[in-house]
């Protein structure tokens, strides 16, 4: 997207990392400045917290995520754009990658026209990149747009493999993947 060429790899990491034991996690005690005063004042986010922005289509979730990406005080922002349309990717890259924050943003983009396996792989790769920077001691903000499209991709794979659908038509593999 940024036309800056290849990225040199310094080390390799497993795509499926080991989850942190919840009992070993530090309690959330510090606020993350997302750069949007209304969110900071009314719905402040803690460093290490997981948050979902849930709303209907066309209400500005992606715009809000791009504003947070540009304005947050996190050291590194990893943005996972999964299942987006081409024009949405172009719009995001124009808004975020052309700003002063581009040096701290890593974008993993897998458009909607790619296979479900690649979309799942893209989401996992973004998480692995975020874990890499976290392990270096950096404050990392991981944004996935859209987790719904990740779940749809996993559902396509699960149903193709013969998994029986459960809640809302999703197979158990989706329900076990999302929390991790």
PLM segments and residue spans:
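Short, function-defining helix-loop hinge/capping sites that tune catalysis or transport
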Residues: 43, 91, 153-154
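P-loop NTPase nucleotide-binding/switch module
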Residues: 1-49, 54-56, 62-67, 99-114, ...
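Juxtamembrane helix-loop transition segments at the membrane interface in multi-pass membrane proteins
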Residues: 93-106, 156-158
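Short, surface-exposed alpha-helical segments at coil->helix boundaries
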Residues: 86-94
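Conserved P-loop NTPase nucleotide-binding/switch module
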Residues: 59-63, 67-76, 81-82, 86-87, ...
